[in-house]
Amino acid sequence: MKRTPFLVTCVVVPSLIGGGLYLEHRRRAAADVPIPVADGRIDVELDQAPPQKRTGAPISLTASDGSGLKLVSIRAEAQVEGPLAFTELHLVFENPESRVREGTFTIDLPASAEVSRFAMKIGSTWQEGEFVEKQAARVAYEDFLHRKQDPALLEQGPGNTFSARVFPIPPRGRKELILTYSEILPASAAYRLPLQGLPEIGSLNVRVHTPRGQARTHELVRKNFSPADDYVIADKGVVEGLSAADLRVVTVRPTAGAGAAEEPIGPTVVLVDTSASRSAGFAEQAEMVAQTLENMGDVPVHVIAFDQTSAPIYTGSAKGFRAGGLEKLRDRKPLGASSLEAGLAAVEGIDKGFGTKRLLLVTDGVVTYGESDGRKLASKLEALRSRGLERADIIAAGGIREKERLDALVAGPLPKAGILVDAAEGGKRIAKRLSKPVLANAEIDVAGAIWVYPKKAIGLQPGDPLVVYAQLPKNVSGTKVTVGTQTFEPKLAEAPMELVERAWAKAKIADLAAHSEDAADAKAQAIELSKRYRVLSPYTSLLVLESDADYERIVARAQAAFKV
């Protein structure tokens, strides 16, 4: 079957607002938003050793003819509170041509990001986006576009990619956008603002406010600057969780099994995603695969590349892959559609004499062809038990990832649980982790909680951070978290309700997607949560129109048509 080239667009964003402002109202000008500044100001330089080099710009606005508009200014404000960070990004793009243009704004956010605001400046006024069911929003956008008015539409794409259709971009003028989001920073994870890969920026101004107990503001100001790396702040304090009324977001580190013996790695099938969604950073991905296999030593491996089809790349000892298979993998090139179903089907074709015990899947989890439902893909993986498969591990590659889908594959359809590990950890560390046992589906409980997410620990190894969300009865103080046989009482700090509430809503939407038996009901509930708590979901968009009357007329009509 001929491999069809697919064009995939992908971009990045990072940053946010400080202090007590966590919930914005429509029609509020950005100039009116107060940004509190903590006492004690220090300068922090760019990170000199990011874990993984990025190819391509993290933020872009591309015109309909494919040409990029110049990013002339970035102003970023971030507030870090324990395991949560809140970021506001103010971006200014410039149209060098003497004609009005329509463009696509794209950005790749952290995997846990919850978008809460998207605004576009029209004239001297900031027009705020409203959360609308996705199809209804598209109908409204097209209607206003044809009327030569000024709409914008922000949607969540594959994984953690967000894109916005923007019109108009004035001739020889500027288009200003604001985007805000919250994200989870587990345990010792640093706050990272993606800048690496951006072209020269006329003005860059970044401020990151760290926890209130330390009251510090980290600042970076540059003119005519081309970032070589991301901006990273590790100064997070000792808070392990946040509370707001009856809601909790906490981080714990289970250590059960830390002294257990290493688990031998048996014959392993290595599935490497070579679809078009992996085009950015494909060379780095191939090198990471080679490094991982080198560190697996004499383990027999069968390496297969897949997109919407599959092709054998190498069979032999893991340590021999660099000499015997790396060049062939590079020559495969990332061109096709993304089909995890095709990859799993390829495992069935391997001779039983190989004695397959392990599966190592290198992918971003993005699916553009074939089965995409995580639970159905897990069932296909479970069917491979009859061929002797015992454990599946996943190396999550690239900045755009479908984490929920990948979690479903490592969650336990096989006799032994596997891990979901970031490709940025590097081949040596990944290979070592593959030989370590996994805390298999340990039950998670929060004493007295009405609701807990996740309900089981997935792909967790001793010492890994685990973020737990919970809703407790009102007026309950303290939080006791149990993971398997271990109990934790994390140190909590009070946080603004709107910040914690949005994290809770995002987790609630993920819980519905993972566990609801009624897909239509889960979607309806997710849309309501998205609109009520201002959290973008796969089922909603942020639609910018010119006036309240426009929302009432166009959106109400479109929503009625789609019975939302």
Predicted regions and their residues:
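VWA/integrin I-like adhesion module and closely mimicked acidic/polar interface patches used
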Residues: G365-L414, L420, E425, A431-K432
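An acidic, Ser/Thr-enriched
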Residues: D108, R117-T161, R165-L271, T292, ...
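Extracytoplasmic/secreted cell-surface and envelope-processing proteins
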Residues: A187-A189, R278-G281, S310-T315, V367-L377, ...
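N-terminal, polar/Ser/Thr-rich
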Residues: L21-G82
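Asparagine-centered strand-capping/turn motif at beta-strand->loop junctions
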Residues: F93-R99, I107-L109
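Short, solvent-exposed beta-strand/turn "edge" segments of beta-rich domains on protein surfaces
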Residues: R75-F86, V92-P96, P168-G173, G459-Q461
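Hydrophobic membrane-insertion alpha-helices, especially the h-region
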Residues: V8-G19
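Von Willebrand factor
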Residues: E262-S317, E341-L344, E348, G355-T363, ...
